[in-house]
């Protein structure tokens, strides 16, 4: 009997043979039979489709009929377009497969093609999504099996029994604790996107050689340091108009022999000591305007100030070097020559300060760069006797990083500007060390009453 032949009741003969439950028949068994028939017909249809796709005769017949009434040019264009579309769709269907998977690795739940390691198991996208939805929405209590929990789960039957599918997910080892709720999932996705964007920016910067500029947080730090410097820097940018030159006859007649071949002019020395106290006070005020410095213990603050005071005063004098008059302006008010500073008590230290001033004149530093140099000198963690060494080192690193990024922002046209500028920190540290040695000789050779109390307090050990 063919499928199209009819019975007396007008029904197909194959339909008549289909079992129909009586009132007392077990509905559960009938349901199982219908499910099996459904699966069988589904598999048969898939098999037929597969044979249909792979049959060379069918492909040839279909191709011939589709181009029978087309011009040769149309055939070429449409065949190329069809091939390209097929390749594109094929790529979409394949999707992304991680490199750690074997070529044809299967889902441990249903046997479909696996796409990755999901919730501690290698699964397909379908089982991953089913497991995630079940946990997120707490659906598993509502699942029930019609066949006593004995369903076989494969890629054909996986959608027919949720309870058995979920039980198999648990059995193979999928972890419920790894499923995130909506808020955590969104936060994780946001974090992943931010990290991707960050890596993208870093790669872009590397590719085009772009140097990072200050972040918002670093700009706040830079602003604080700059304001502290401007507020404590005597005369500011008007120092040239307000300076007064030390008379030429002062500092030219040495009257006290000092060690190391230097001379001390007591008149010049007395002039310098008059401006030294306000100069030291301004350095202390600069430090106290920095929140990081104020957070340190009092003992560490004193050690840092005593260590950097001469270095910062030398820097402030060096950036006010005037090549026309060949003078340095001390504390924003007194312009002195190299000889006057040397004979006034500093000896060879004056040469180092003048050489630094001549060198820095080509750097064209602004107030912010001078301020950041001072902050780096202040937060030197290698000063003897410090308690919070790691903390101070961290603070200096913050200043250095902000400083470097600010240099990038300024875009100086000096080759290797940043490393050259860092070398000036070394020069200033050397000046501080030389002055400490020179101070001992000055105490021996000069009358004690000429030394201001603050000068002695800062530079005496």
UniProtKB/Swiss-Prot annotation:
Region (Interaction with NR2F6): 244-461
Residue ranges flagged as DNA-binding region: 107-181
Positions contributing to Zn(2+) 1 binding: 107, 110, 124, 127
Keyword terms of this UniProt record: DNA-binding, Metal-binding, Nucleus, Receptor, Transcription, Transcription regulation, Zinc, Zinc-finger
Binding site for 3,3',5-triiodo-L-thyronine: 282, 331
Recorded superkingdom: Eukaryota
SUPFAM superfamilies linked: Glucocorticoid receptor-like (DNA-binding domain) (SSF57716), Nuclear receptor ligand-binding domain (SSF48508)
PROSITE patterns listed in its UniProt record: NR_LBD, NUCLEAR_REC_DBD_1, NUCLEAR_REC_DBD_2
Region of interest called Disordered, as start-end residue ranges on this chain: 1-24
Alphabetical list of CDD domains matching this protein: NR_DBD_TR, NR_LBD_TR
Entry keyword annotation includes Zinc: yes
Residues reported to bind L-thyroxine: 282, 331, 435
InterPro entries attached to this UniProt entry: NHR-like_dom_sf, Nucl_hrmn_rcpt_lig-bd, Nuclear_hormone_rcpt_NR1, Nuclear_hrmn_rcpt, ThyrH_rcpt, Znf_hrmn_rcpt, Znf_NHR/GATA
Localization, UniProt: Nucleus
Alphabetical GO biological process terms: animal organ morphogenesis; cellular response to thyroid hormone stimulus; female courtship behavior; mRNA transcription by RNA polymerase II; negative regulation of DNA-templated transcription; negative regulation of female receptivity; negative regulation of transcription by RNA polymerase II; positive regulation of thyroid hormone receptor signaling pathway
Residues reported to bind Zn(2+) 2: 145, 151, 161, 164
Similarity comment: Belongs to the nuclear hormone receptor family. NR1 subfamily.
Domain notes: Composed of three domains: a modulating N-terminal domain, a DNA-binding domain and a C-terminal ligand-binding domain.
Quaternary structure and partners: Binds DNA as a dimer; homodimer and heterodimer with RXRB. Interacts with the coactivators NCOA1/SRC1, NCOA2/GRIP1, NCOA7 and MED1/TRAP220 in a ligand-inducible manner. Interacts with the corepressor NCOR1 in absence of ligand. Interacts with C1D. Interacts with NR2F6; the interaction impairs the binding of the THRB homodimer and THRB:RXRB heterodimer to T3 response elements. Interacts with PRMT2 and THRSP. Interacts with TACC1; this interaction is decreased in the presence of thyroid hormone T3.
Function: Nuclear hormone receptor that can act as a repressor or activator of transcription. High affinity receptor for thyroid hormones, including triiodothyronine and thyroxine.
Official protein name in the record: Thyroid hormone receptor beta
Organism: Mus musculus (Mouse)
